From Swiss-Prot:
Homodimer or homotetramer. It is found in: Cytoplasm. It is an enzyme of class 1 (oxidoreductase). GO terms for cellular component: cytosol. The active site is at 91 (proton acceptor). The lineage of its organism: Eukaryota, Fungi, Dikarya, Ascomycota, Pezizomycotina. There is a cross-link at residues 90-238 (Tryptophyl-tyrosyl-methioninium (Trp-Tyr) (with M-264)). Heme b binds at residue 279. This is Catalase-peroxidase. Gene3D superfamilies: 1.10.520.10, Peroxidase, domain 2. Signal peptide: none annotated. Keywords: Cytoplasm, Heme, Hydrogen peroxide, Iron, Metal-binding, Oxidoreductase, Peroxidase. It comes from Chaetomium globosum (strain ATCC 6205 / CBS 148.51 / DSM 1962 / NBRC 6347 / NRRL 1970) (Soil fungus). PROSITE patterns: PEROXIDASE_1, PEROXIDASE_2, PEROXIDASE_4.
Length: 749
């Protein structure tokens, strides 16, 4: 554990790799993840159908039985695994972040590296093994992704807490997700990249960040965490429980908490409720210094069978357990839902002390030992708290909420139930994906709700009539295509947010995004609203939504440009502004979008890297990425109507000209400013084209060029049109979980 190792193997993918020679090489691997070939199930396996065949109540009973079935190989604290399983579920879901929708519990990624070996996940390998008999019994009817989170819910219920509900619907993945940026640090618990002048981390064995010699050169009260991260250290879920960089400052800890929990979509009230609610149960573990702890699961020897953090202190388990290095039990009844956390937080005054592992923590002053021991019924402890717990009292805003919860236990219980439900379900997507008998009836704003269809849908004849009406408005086809793309391409495969359903492109904040060209967008929407009003006014029962018309406008324009039929399935509805959380949707705004030739790279991230990242959010494969960029360019879908990348003399026609002309060796390219390039005739020097990095990469990058050559060949036109229409239709329907998903490149996660 500690620094990144070097792979010296000369087989099985070992040795010096392309990324070692060219670390800045554009990597397309994230566009090839989670393909059917990686799954042990057949392509026909339907997880939703399997889940629906599950005896859900029997499963919950079996999970409940595990809670108090203490195993000698990993004994339960206080005879109950509830606290451990709450932490397991929390740490599965808690990796979610709002900026890109990645992380979270919806893929069961806690089973894989790096998450399975993060310092913050010490001992969760044991939690998952405790659940194996349950998973083994129910097999493919319950995914690990669902089981990890459901178990946390059942743990709360088994200790007397009434939860808000639960929804399943998370198919498992079968490989580590390589798409998420977890930070640039090379050492566990480091934060010198995310904060610039941060802590270098633990350079050897250890799970505690306790090097005081490194902590005098940065201002923990003003530092800014880099985006899209939502954790203060490499390998932590949120913040350092000892305080920022191990400094026991509750006020500064409050600042870190607000940043990290906010980036996980939680407001102050939800944050206080989650911390206090979670810390009502169980304990932390720091029986001895971290030097006693051995390798994490990914570095552990084979005979440990995927278990890590072998502990040579005492028995290495039970009272000798080491996880965070902190040794805190928060309440007098750590296996019951009580109000002790807030009662003790404000009742006692606290003084700084050290855990047996040497970590900073706090102990109550002038009181008697009242806290039970996890294994010795004759032993009592003084009340203790973490620095991050005290932040709920000493941060001014958190204190107001904490005191209100102290005085109103019912408010606290309701707030925790709702925040916990949000934590577990934030990345599950729309309700059309939710499964099971415990789905709450109350619809919550963070679900991005859309109205149900309450009218007959348009039929094929109506669609034909509507397409004619749209084209008759006089709006340029390129604008219709651009608007449809802008609406649908907000989708994010991580948290399943965005997409065309809801027509939120007409609402704040999307209607004002620069990338959506607001004047052009307003023109298109006005025309489509006219078509909608005319059709709905003339129909006695059938209605068409603006969400459907936006997509249909793109379909009509595309059919005109390509001379082929483009699939369209009605059924979208229009969300209201009241159903749209503006601050939350602001995170979906692209600052660089190579599909629409918008924005520029930064000193750290190139335009083409932003393009691949957006392609991943759209769940695209490399060929889909290439064909969509090439098609959108010749169709004139650049956000501002610019000619960058429009490598054709017949714009508005769906041709393979983009690839033909990009690959033409009669053109010599030169950089204008490192972002924009000119293509000139090699013989005459005459300027022929302009393009951006998001265009030239399709000729410069070996793998993308190989794909471009297929579409740019003399036989490539028909394939290009066919593949563009398929990829276009895929994007238009990414959020249509009410539909089957033909042609998907992988599981509909």
């Amino acid at each position: 554990m500690g620094e990144c190792p070097v792979n010296h193997a000369n087989v099985a993918g070992g040795g010096t790799r392309n990324n070692d020679w060219w670390p800045n090489q554009l990597r397309l691997n994230i566009l090839r993840q989670h393909q059917p070939a990686s799954s042990p199930y057949s392509k026909e396996f339907d997880y939703a159908a399997a889940f629906k065949s599950l005896d859900y109540e029997a499963l919950k009973k079996d999970i409940t039985a595990v809670m108090t079935d203490s195993q000698d190989w990993w004994p339960a604290d206080f005879g109950h695994y509830g606290g451990l399983f709450i932490r397991m579920a929390w740490h599965s879901a808690g990796t979610y972040r709002v900026f890109d929708g990645r992380g979270g519990g919806s893929q069961g990624q806690q089973r894989f590296a790096p998450l399975n070996s993060w310092p913050d996940n010490v001992s969760l390998d044991k939690a998952r093994r405790l659940l194996w008999p349950v998973k083994q019994k129910y097999g493919d009817k319950i995914s690990w992704a669902d089981l990890l989170l459901l178990t946390g819910n059942v743990a709360l219920e088994s200790m007397g807490f009434k939860t808000f509900g639960f929804a399943g619907g998370r198919p498992d993945t079968w490989e580590a997700d390589e798409s998420a940026y977890w930070g640039g640090e090379k050492t566990w618990l480091g934060n010198d990249v995310r904060y610039g002048q941060g802590n270098e981390g633990v350079a050897g064995q250890g799970v505690v960040d306790g090097d005081e010699s490194k902590k005098g050169h940065r201002d923990i009260h003003s530092r800014d965490l880099e985006s899209p991260l939502a954790a203060a250290h490499m390998g932590l879920i949120y913040v350092n429980p000892e305080g920022p960089d191990g400094i026991p400052d509750p006020v500064a800890a409050g600042r870190d908490i607000r940043t990290t929990f906010g980036r996980m979509a939680m407001n102050d009230e939800e944050t206080v409720a989650l911390i206090a609610g979670g810390h009502t149960f169980g304990k932390t573990h720091g029986a001895a210094p971290a030097v006693n702890v051995s390798k994490e699961p990914e570095a552990a020897p084979l005979e440990q069978q995927g278990l890590g953090w072998s502990n040579k202190h005492g028995t290495g388990k039970g009272p000798d357990t080491i996880t965070s290095g902190l040794e805190v039990i928060w309440t007098k009844e750590p296996t019951k839902w009580t109000h002790n956390f807030f009662e003790y937080l404000f009742k006692f005054e606290w003084e700084l002390t050290k855990s047996p592992a040497g970590a900073n923590q706090w102990v109550a002053k002038n009181t008697e030992p009242i806290i039970p021991d996890a294994f010795d019924p004759n032993k009592k402890h003084l009340p203790r708290m973490l620095t991050t717990d005290l932040a709920l009292r000493f941060d001014p805003e958190y204190e107001k909420i904490s005191r209100r919860f102290l005085e109103n236990p019912d408010q606290f219980a309701d707030a925790f139930a709702r925040a916990w439900f949000k934590l577990l379900h934030r990345d599950l997507g729309p309700r059309s994906r939710w499964l099971g008998p415990e789905i709450p009836s109350e619809v919550l704003i963070w679900e991005d709700p859309v109205p149900a269809v309450n009218h007959p849908l348009v039929d094929e004849q109506d669609v034909t009539t509507l397409k004619r009406a749209i084209l008759a408005t006089g709006v340029a086809p390129a604008k219709l295509i651009s608007t449809a793309w802008a609406s649908a391409s907000t989708f994010r495969g991580g948290d399943k947010r965005g997409g065309a359903n809801g027509a939120r492109i007409r609402l704040a904040p999307q209607k004002d995004w620069k990338v959506n060209n607001p004047p052009q967008l307003a023109e298109v929407l006005k025309a489509l609203e006219g078509v909608q009003a005319q059709f709905n006014g003339a129909s006695q029962s059938k209605k068409v939504s603006l969400a459907d018309l936006i997509v249909l406008g793109g379909v009509a324009a595309l059919e005109q440009a390509a001379g082929v039929s483009v699939p369209f399935t009605p059924g979208r509805t229009d969300a209201s502004q009241e159903q749209t959380e503006v601050e939350s949707f602001a995170h979906l705004e692209p600052h660089v979008d190579g599909f629409r030739s918008y924005g520029r790279g930064t000193s750290r991230v190139s335009t083409e890297q932003f393009l691949v990242d957006r392609a991943h959010l759209l769940t695209l494969t490399p060929p889909e990425l290439a064909v969509l960029v090439g098609g959108l360019r010749v169709l004139g879908a650049n956000y501002d109507g610019s000619s960058n990348g429009v490598f054709t003399t017949r714009p508005g026609k769906l041709t393979n000209d983009y690839f033909v002309n990009l690959l033409d060796m009669a053109t010599a390219w030169k950089s204008v400013d490192g972002e924009v390039f000119e293509g000139n005739d090699r013989k005459t020097g005459e300027k022929k084209w302009t393009g951006t990095r998001a265009d030239l990469v399709f000729g410069a990058h070996a793998e993308l060029r190989a794909i471009s050559e297929v579409y740019g060949s003399s036989s490539g036109q028909d394939k290009f049109v066919k593949d563009f229409v398929a990829a276009w239709s895929k994007v238009m329907n990414l959020d249509r979980y009410d539909l089957a998903q033909p042609g998907s490149s992988g599981p509909k996660l």
